[in-house]
Amino acid sequence: MAFRENVLEILEEITETEEVVQNTNIKLFDEGLLDSMATVQLLIEIEEKLDITVPVSEFDRDEWATPEMIITQLEALK
């Protein structure tokens, strides 16, 4: 499975909706699909499944607002 699909699969699991796959520009926080607890869960899943550690200093909610932005940020950290 490609990196992009892996990230979207993780997001779909965390948010419990396919909407994140269908609309990769959806504002996850504004739509209530991610909150602080879900964000922690997301970062743990990313580390476990993709072997990418996201330093807390690198996490800026404004830069991680959509699935597309998350994919871009993670590609930079690979």
Curated annotation (Swiss-Prot):
The modification O-(pantetheine 4'-phosphoryl)serine is found at residue 36. One of its GO terms (biological process) is lipoteichoic acid biosynthetic process. GO terms for molecular function: D-alanyl carrier activity. It is found in: Cytoplasm. Pathway: Cell wall biogenesis; lipoteichoic acid biosynthesis. Gene3D superfamilies: ACP-like. The keyword DNA-binding does not apply. One of its GO terms (cellular component) is cytoplasm. It comes from the Bacteria. 4'-phosphopantetheine is transferred from CoA to a specific serine of apo-DCP. Residues 1-78 form the Carrier domain. InterPro entries: ACP-like_sf, DltC, PP-bd_ACP. Disulfide bonds: none annotated. Keywords: Cell wall biogenesis/degradation, Cytoplasm, Phosphopantetheine, Phosphoprotein. Its main location: cytoplasm. Belongs to the DltC family. Carrier protein involved in the D-alanylation of lipoteichoic acid (LTA). The loading of thioester-linked D-alanine onto DltC is catalyzed by D-alanine--D-alanyl carrier protein ligase DltA. The DltC-carried D-alanyl group is further transferred to cell membrane phosphatidylglycerol (PG) by forming an ester bond, probably catalyzed by DltD. D-alanylation of LTA plays an important role in modulating the properties of the cell wall in Gram-positive bacteria, influencing the net charge of the cell wall. This is D-alanyl carrier protein. The lineage of its organism: Bacteria, Bacillati, Bacillota, Bacilli, Bacillales.
